[in-house]
Amino acid sequence: LTMKIEEATVYVLSERNGGLKTEQIAEIINRRRLHVRKDGLPVSSAQVFAAVMRNSQVFAKSEGRIMLLLLM
């Protein structure tokens, strides 16, 4: 089983302090095969960006990087 792209993004960011660029997140997701598209193509940075935009309660953007929001 693979994760949803949002879950894979959370997983990747939970390991990295300071956040990552969407290109870096997509590269890690593809390398580790955390999310596999139905058509078999690699996850793109645009898909990561779209997932981040759909989940503004989870992710923050700052200085070109995506970070996890801390939920208290």
Predicted regions and their residues:
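Charged low-complexity interaction tracts in eukaryotic proteins
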Residues: T2-E6, R16, L20-E23, I29-M72
